[in-house]
């Protein structure tokens, strides 16, 4: 990994590059095409978006990775609520994947989240990509989500 990597907050001037990067990173990964670049564009104006945790990784003046966070809440069976964070999309330019940049971005974002007083992050993602960072699968039985429980950008109990 190059030593000249900068972790910083995304700026408005980065928006087009981040959206192109996100499209390239996700295109045809899970379904034909992708929607993650559109999600990135929409998240910036969502009330749960956390600008302090909208981060880019820059290498030699080029944005090569990005992560965005939103506020959310987790509600258990007894109705007890806990404020949490969710992140995504998290992406690394295809030519820079599997070189440690995603880990650097994720760990830097966790440090900043902790600095804001946040201690819980819940995501929808491929467990193989995140278990090495301490994440555990919340659905070990691999039960499918109810159609009404699909992830969305609005607040609500986890399904």
Functional labels for PLM-detected ranges:
Residues 73-82:
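A short, polar/charged loop-to-alpha-helix boundary motif
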Residues 19, 23-68, 73-74:
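Active-site rim helix/loop that mediates acceptor-substrate recognition in acyltransferases
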Residues 96, 100-108, 118:
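Conserved acetyl-CoA pyrophosphate-binding loop and the N-cap/start of the following alpha-helix
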Residues 115-121, 125-149:
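Conserved active-site alpha-helix within GNAT-family acetyltransferase domains
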Residues 89-97:
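A short, internal acetyl-CoA/4′-phosphopantetheine-binding micro-motif in the GNAT/acyltransferase core
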Residues 1-13, 20:
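Conserved N-terminal entry element of GNAT/NAT acetyltransferase domains
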Residues 60, 149-159:
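NAD(P)-dependent dehydrogenase/reductase Rossmann-like domain
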């Amino acid at each position: 990994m190059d030593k000249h990597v900068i972790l910083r907050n995304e700026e408005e001037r980065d928006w087009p590059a981040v959206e192109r990067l996100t499209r390239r990173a996700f295109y045809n990964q899970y379904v034909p095409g992708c929607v993650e670049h559109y999600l990135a564009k929409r998240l910036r104006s969502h009330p749960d978006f956390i600008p302090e945790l909208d981060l880019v990784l820059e290498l030699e003046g080029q944005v090569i990775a990005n992560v965005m966070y939103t506020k959310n809440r987790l509600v258990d069976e007894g109705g007890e609520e806990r404020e949490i964070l969710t992140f995504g999309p998290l992406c690394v330019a295809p030519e820079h994947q599997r070189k440690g940049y995603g880990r650097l971005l994720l760990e830097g974002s966790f440090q900043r989240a902790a600095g804001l007083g946040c201690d819980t992050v819940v995501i929808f993602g491929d467990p193989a990509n995140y278990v090495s960072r301490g994440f555990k699968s919340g659905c070990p039985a691999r039960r499918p989500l109810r159609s009404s429980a699909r992830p969305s950008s609005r607040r609500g109990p986890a399904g």
